[in-house]
């Protein structure tokens, strides 16, 4: 699966941007006011730039997608829930047969 550049949730267009690194050093963010998911291609760990794998980028996309979806539903998804859901979605795509 490839990360989309744009998609709709609740009839709102969400733009996806891949950047080299976020100032926060997070893997990704969702900005509900600007309707943008931003995904970092790298993070800094112990003063070392670590390039994220395709799997990590996809997992981050789904994590932020869950936050975007929940914003339009009830805005109460915790980081742990978003991470769990994104893990399950990635596992579905990685292990499907046929």
Identify the residue ranges that each predicted region occupies.
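Catalytic zinc-binding patch centered on the HExxH motif and its immediate surroundings
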Residues: 2-8, 17-40, 46-48
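Well-ordered beta-strand scaffold positions
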Residues: 12-14
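Short pre-active-site segment immediately N-terminal to the catalytic Zn-binding motif
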Residues: 37-60, 72-73
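Short active-site segment of divalent metal-dependent hydrolases/proteases
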Residues: 62, 66-70
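Post-HExxH zinc-binding segment in Zn-dependent metallohydrolases
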Residues: 73-98
């Amino acid at each position: 699966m490839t990360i989309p550049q744009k998609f709709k949730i609740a009839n709102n267009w969400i733009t996806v941007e891949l950047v080299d690194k976020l100032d926060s050093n997070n893997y990704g963010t969702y900005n509900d006011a600007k309707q943008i998911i931003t995904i970092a291609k790298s993070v800094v760990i112990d003063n070392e730039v670590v390039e994220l794998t395709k799997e990590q980028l996809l997992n981050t996309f789904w994590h932020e997608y869950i936050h975007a979806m929940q914003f339009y539903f009830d805005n109460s998804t915790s980081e742990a829930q978003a991470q769990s859901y994104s893990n399950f979605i990635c596992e579905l795509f990685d292990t499907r047969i046929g």
